Amino acid sequence: MLMLLVRGTRYENHRSKVTLPTPLGGRSNETTLCESPGPDTGIRWRRSDEALRVNVGGVRRLLSARALARFPGTRLGRLQAAASEEQARRLCDDYDAAAREFYFDRHPGFFLGLLHFYRTGHLHVLDELCVFAFGQEADYWGLGENALAACCRARYLERRVTRPRAWDEDSDTPSSVDPCPDEISDVQRELARYGAARCGRLRRRLWLTMENPGYSLPSKLFSCVSISVVLASIAAMCIHSLPEYQAREAAAAVAAVAAGRSAEGVRDDPVLRRLEYFCIAWFSFEVSSRLLLAPSTRNFFCHPLNLIDIVSVLPFYLTLLAGAALGDQGGTGGKEFGHLGKVVQVFRLMRIFRVLKLARHSTGLRSLGATLKHSYREVGILLLYLAVGVSVFSGVAYTAEKEEHVGFDTIPACWWWGTVSMTTVGYGDVVPVTVAGKLAASGCILGGILVVALPITIIFNKFSHFYRRQKALEAAVRNSNHQEFEDLLSSVDGVSEASLETSRETSQEGRSADLETQAPSEPPHAQMY
């Protein structure tokens, strides 16, 4: 039996001769077609001009050898030119020798666009796929960016560069803030580490109590106490700088020196010193507890919030070591300890970093950190624009005002004026007096407004996105049923990372089966392209 496929229509004939339509003004053409070897002959692999039967996610099509030969570098083009069955199997997911059909577990919607590419030579972007899924499919089938049609190339490149995830700046829809599966997998992987650990269940509960304020009532109380201690520490540091406390400490230091004692131990108010010790004890308890309860010590030291906790207590202990070193020198010190007192003051100044501990309990601060992390290009562009503008207008102002002796004596001295002018702060400590200098100042201010406004808009949009995303995650934790959350935690007892990988592969197979089930129904015969 012979089979002829013309534009998607199949014609069958049991004879070896098929009469084709007669050309205009010509004579009848009688062509003899050779039967292709059956799948069980075991003599030849495939004819070079034989149509390729493929099944992509449940969508079956027949592709002509002529269309595939136009693009030999693509996956289907290489499959058509495969010299053996083993070589062909390496290019597909499965092969049915009886039906001579190649199976691919890929997106069926993209495959329909791929068929259009083999007909026209141009690939169009599909709105049903995100830019990264579309790029992965294109790479799998061996298509590059040059294959994109001119009408879709600019849109694809813009979405790939500026929109890592499709989100609308003015929309609060859940699709713009949904957590990705990678975040959920990271949480499951962290929880799975407690399965094989000693006292894993207890450590897991304590870790969630300290890390997740919405986990239980004790976790909320712990969060409130932590915030109160941070605020008390910051308030004590600010009160310590008031003039009356400075005068009191100076008088106590003079009295100690007059009595022949060291002045190092009397420079702090007793109440503030006790409050400082209490705050340091609480911060040390937090750091040590999180370190002992953390599922991974390596990940603990890689987390920015944990590094902030360490920095908040490190200056206190360094100050104690420096004080002990000064005490060993009898309070006078040697040449090598001449500037150690200034180093101690620097360590005390580092206490201001404790305010960053509020980021663990503040959605806005965490969103700001994520924004700066993902906006380093925009921040770099902003600094570059400011540097160029300050350099140019500082030189112009120096040239116009150097004879007036009003503070524009050197170009580096003009940098301060250029910075406060471009950022539209304008302290007024240094102002131009000549007409040329005032024109330069006007251009500097207008240029600063334009230069600063352009990147700030992009950074603000990213901050809004990350803030809404973080609020949505916190709302999901608050609204989740506590018993269901406990069941989820119980389900990961004893689960290893290997089992998580196995479950992930199983879920991918399930999604592939769903694609086959949801694929559009096909006629009994395959269509030819």
Swiss-Prot record:
Residues 494-529 are annotated as: Disordered. SUPFAM superfamilies: POZ domain, Voltage-gated potassium channels. Gene3D superfamilies: 1.10.287.70, Potassium Channel Kv1.1, Chain A, Voltage-gated potassium channels. Chain C. The keyword Transport applies. GO terms for molecular function: delayed rectifier potassium channel activity; potassium channel regulator activity. The chain crosses the membrane at residues 218-239, 271-293, 305-322, 341-361, 377-398, 439-467. Pfam families: BTB_2 (PF02214), Ion_trans (PF00520). One of its GO terms (biological process) is regulation of potassium ion transmembrane transport. It is found in: Cell membrane. Residues 412-423, 424-431 dip into the membrane without crossing it. Residues 502-514 have a biased composition (Basic and acidic residues). Residues 1-217, 294-304, 362-376, 468-529 are cytoplasmic. Keywords: Cell membrane, Ion channel, Ion transport, Membrane, Potassium, Potassium channel, Potassium transport, Transmembrane, Transmembrane helix, Transport, Voltage-gated channel. It comes from the Eukaryota. One of its GO terms (cellular component) is voltage-gated potassium channel complex. Residues 240-270, 323-340, 399-411, 432-438 are extracellular. It is a multi-pass membrane protein. A motif (Selectivity filter) lies at residues 424-429. Its main location: membrane. The transmembrane segment S4 functions as a voltage-sensor and is characterized by a series of positively charged amino acids at every third position. Channel opening and closing is effected by a conformation change that affects the position and orientation of the voltage-sensor paddle formed by S3 and S4 within the membrane. A transmembrane electric field that is positive inside would push the positively charged S4 segment outwards, thereby opening the pore, while a field that is negative inside would pull the S4 segment inwards and close the pore. Heterotetramer with KCNB1. Heterotetramer with KCNB2. Does not form homomultimers. Belongs to the potassium channel family. S (TC 1.A.1.2) subfamily. Kv9.1/KCNS1 sub-subfamily. Potassium channel regulatory subunit that modulate the delayed rectifier voltage-gated potassium channel activity of KCNB1 and KCNB2 by altering their kinetics, expression levels, and shifting the half-inactivation potential to more polarized values. While it does not form functional channels on its own, it can form functional heterotetrameric channels with KCNB1 and KCNB2. Each regulatory subunit has unique regulatory properties that can lead to extensive inhibition, significant changes in kinetics, and/or substantial shifts in the voltage dependencies of the inactivation process. This is Delayed-rectifier potassium channel regulatory subunit KCNS1. It comes from Saimiri boliviensis boliviensis. The gene is KCNS1.
